[in-house]
């Protein structure tokens, strides 16, 4: 170790020496005299700083002295020359330890060139000596003052004052040793730049100059040792956001910036080639990691999956027709739209367009642009799927129109009443009832003012008026149906009045009067009711002659019914009529009365109350058969008068029947009777008695109660009408066919409006002209109207 | 005036200067005919009636412009010529023959004669009326008389100054016992009337010399009908009367006492009769009672009207509510022909020049029926426009094409059977003018529509050449309207 150190030291010394030698050598090469001067200066310095002993040393080291001594001791030097040389070349510190070093180095010579040392772990460690370059080392620049004793220990010169010889053969004097100098050193101040080292090349104590000390300080302070270096120079911003007027470089843009690099292309092609040949795999093939973990059990859900038939709700997408020429990217010219068509297509609303695309000629497929509507269509399709998924509807392929019965249009069913032709004004208060006479010339009306009036039908001229009810309204007026005599029956208050209006020709008037007068004798011939029976309520009333005032006005007979009759209906032959008193106070046995004109006879055919359905409302004779129809609130019953039997019960299903009518030609044209029933609960019901007890058809067209229904009396026009409290009449066409197979067809024809609603009441009664398709209505507003 | 017309025609021509058509203007009337030399004229097709009328006036050199109407192929030009050509598919290169006639001037209201009750019938005695011509009498202008039969049972004779010259006697003195629905002059001195009292009454009418008072005296009572009489027709040269009654029969009567048979006993009011008792008691005069020459009864419903053929008094026509029009041979009282329509017929008028019968129907229109047996179609034309039953018809004295109708809707309408339009029902006539009731206008309700013609129904209308259009109705008045040559004759 010490050897290595020595060698290292030596190297270092050598280096130092070299540096110094360099410095000096350069000078020396140029001016030899200056070298001497320098050394002289050094000597001067040392002499200035040191005392006489130094002078002594100086003396010793003077060139002349050394030369002399070298000559004297030249023989002895080779034996001991190496060590002093080593010491000389080493640092001055090494020089101080020279004696011990010498001992070790001498023992080293017998040892191998390595040592075994213990390292930190206690293991053996071989440490080899450093290899000396020896002979091969080239000391090209041997310094003048360098010791030339060679590779001999310096200890050989221990006996001598010099330590070797320089290149000129002069003795190199041994520098003064520490022991000699210590006393001096201690006695003097340590000057600035004192290092305590000995310059090995000069043997003088190494002193550092001011510059060197400054340099050392900078190194110690981690400063840049270079002189004149300013770490705080002002910053020059070369690249900043400031737009310079003159650019840093005005060079034109180099070509490489915009020309594709051929080099890169070459490189890319190389890679491409390699990829093609398979030398480079563009991506790492996924390594099939088949780590069959035996601990995990995988279940294959679809292992035994088999083809299944489609779900019943599966709806395959509708098949689109194959594309045609128009959809081609290069359609034949005749499919291309001209400018006009193109403009029309563009201007049309997208929804109105006949087709969604415009045939366009692109020339070639590669010129076809991307489909602009793609995203939109996909989006809409998604919306469709979300909002309106495809559903299979079980659709019947039947035109709904064909299911409807074929109703003829009203135009084809003319004539029917459509406009108001005449207004009959004169009644004060409501007109409760009206009737057109069998000849169709006159109209009889009765109203709340207690008068019965007869009008000329066409012109609306009032021909005759009689006030029959003093207080009570005239509830109903009805003409006797046959034409051989003219009799008007009117019900006002508790009485029935039979009137022959004085508007007839003498012959007919006489016939009418005779008809009515004939009964007086018959009634008189009958035994008068006994006094005991007189008081009984069930006794049929006796017909009486009217008062003189009434008789002058054409009233011929009065039937005191004792209860208010609201319905009169004549038998078609004109000899009988039936009256109904629907009042709740009326005894059931007296509600319905049949009056015989020729005998002045009143009979009560029903002794008991009709079961179910409340009090009777109205009654009509069958137009051809001896059957009496009686309606109570909920049912219509047919009684065979000759056999005195209940024939049929008709249940219209209405809550409260207001009126009904029997088809005039029913049962003569066809086998069955047809009935229309109007009810206060707004329903008009058509009954075909052959079909069912229940209504064949229910017509609910009115907003309020239906007051009256009536068939056209002649078989000529298959019309019927109803009158309602909503102030309107409705005209229907209801044809009854002769054969049994087809049912009656009912066509609503016309709503006749005109009557004002007065006190919640609209049209109170209606009647048809016996021949024409004209109809008359009695309104609660005090007018009657003729509709034609 | 002419300058204005020129500018209008210039404006019209500038509008459609691009198309022109060659027209030949002709007229059948001598006084307004263009000179022979006038050849076809090239006119713009944009011209309408007014521009054409101006053109003709200019050609005639009239100082006072006369309005003209123009007929192309027998139909009135109601559009521009261009539209007419387009509508009828006629090339503009053909020469169009356009006939022009004097335009109808809207008839103006002259006077209204107020009555106490509804007026059911009206007739006119004037220099040009039939009764005058039959009697070869002379009625000086200004001395025209108007006869009205009212619903109060009285006949009234009016002069043109709205004064009543004469009134028929009351029922007690041999007058009508009920409303009069028909009244006519037979001659300037005799009147026939009928009504709801089932009698036809002949009256003698005498006038004082000054013409301000007169007297109607009952002449004959004709019994035979069992129900009210709706209309009368007279033919003075043969002394015959036709009556239409609601008892489904037509009475054929003679105006001469000597000709007529005795009255049927059962129809003559007797003391036994209840209703005539009161009347008989107070009756102070005895009037000859006669029966019908014949009762023509084959109608099945009230007969609304019966008329004589204009040319042949032995032929009668009748219409009835039973929808039929019947032709009668009055000599033998035999039914010749029956023409059935689909509606009740309420009035009848003969248009002899066209061999047509015009009948008013309850279905609010007038049907023109060809009564000849050779005619294949029953209805030649329908005139539509009324809104209620048409109950009275009268011919235009000026024109064989003209017609006036009175309806229950409260209007009288003037028709020209050449003014037609093609409907989906075929050729349909349109009314030329509509005369409303003055009474409505006086009430300030001219525009108000009466439901069913309430209060303003027209019952009778008569068109006389010198007096004008006389109509009577439910508003208790006779209304006289006159237009100077209302319809052009042609």
From Swiss-Prot, chain A:
GO BP terms, alphabetized: maturation of 5.8S rRNA from tricistronic rRNA transcript (SSU-rRNA, 5.8S rRNA, LSU-rRNA); maturation of LSU-rRNA from tricistronic rRNA transcript (SSU-rRNA, 5.8S rRNA, LSU-rRNA)
Biased composition (Pro residues): 318-335
Localisation: Nucleus, Nucleolus; Nucleus, Nucleoplasm
Family matches, as InterPro entries: BOP1/Erb1 (IPR028598), BOP1_N_dom (IPR012953), WD40/YVTN_repeat-like_dom_sf (IPR015943), WD40_repeat_CS (IPR019775), WD40_repeat_dom_sf (IPR036322), WD40_rpt (IPR001680)
Keyword rRNA processing included in the entry's annotation: yes
Basic and acidic residues composition-biased segments: 115-125, 337-354
Compositional bias ranges of the Basic residues kind: 1-12
Skewed-composition ranges (Acidic residues): 41-79, 100-111
Keyword terms of this UniProt record: Nucleus, Repeat, Ribosome biogenesis, rRNA processing, WD repeat
One example GO MF annotation: large ribosomal subunit rRNA binding
Quaternary context: Component of the NOP7 complex, composed of erb1, nop7 and ytm1. The complex is held together by erb1, which interacts with nop7 via its N-terminal domain and with ytm1 via a high-affinity interaction between the seven-bladed beta-propeller domains of the 2 proteins. The NOP7 complex associates with the 66S pre-ribosome.
Name the record gives this protein: Ribosome biogenesis protein erb1
Species the sequence originates in: Aspergillus niger (strain ATCC MYA-4892 / CBS 513.88 / FGSC A1513)
Swiss-Prot record, chain B:
Ranges occupied by WD repeats: 129-168, 175-213, 224-263, 298-338, 340-379, 385-425, 453-490
Location of this chain's protein in the cell: Nucleus, Nucleolus; Nucleus, Nucleoplasm
Classification via Gene3D superfamilies: YVTN repeat-like/Quinoprotein amine dehydrogenase
One GO biological process term: protein-RNA complex remodeling
GO molecular function, a single term: ribonucleoprotein complex binding
GTP-binding is among the record's keywords: no
Record PANTHER family: RIBOSOME BIOGENESIS PROTEIN WDR12, WD40 REPEAT PROTEIN 12, 37
Protein name: Ribosome biogenesis protein ytm1
Native source species: Aspergillus niger (strain ATCC MYA-4892 / CBS 513.88 / FGSC A1513)
Lineage of the organism: Eukaryota, Fungi, Dikarya, Ascomycota, Pezizomycotina
